[in-house]
């Protein structure tokens, strides 16, 4: 019960929480009003970096959402050329994470990490089409247990300036395992083959729990 009300936070949030807490204490001695505002901001920092446990649906027939947020695109596209898959057609689901969503990302399937590729870039609004090509991003090329290529892309947004990767090349992942996070508003794209989408544009998703696609 306690962990549902006060979930643990991601390690990336520790220093931000300490800094915000220290500033709050100082401001409370100077001004009750400023201290209260700072306290509210400290609570928001805690809320942003929360890392709640999820009930993972481990089923190789499904892909689960890699992110909390809102589905902004469901389409068929060429695979990402950055990982050498632009010669194949994939379906792609894009999920936008606003600053109030949990920003810890999870793998949509069980399988092996074949490649991780970081691409520096710009910081356009993550909901724009050009964000997939121009923004700072991190690619995870996975192979599911049936041999399908699944690619997850973390895309930094207008405010997000830090992509965190917690996964290694060659690592075997269980469905719903944490793979990283993005700070302060961002987007996750999932490219997949041989699955059919189960979500629609405008639908809210929960990482590790919402079923994105089915074989």
Give the residues covered by each predicted segment.
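Contiguous, well-folded functional domains in the mature portion of proteins
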Residues: 1-215
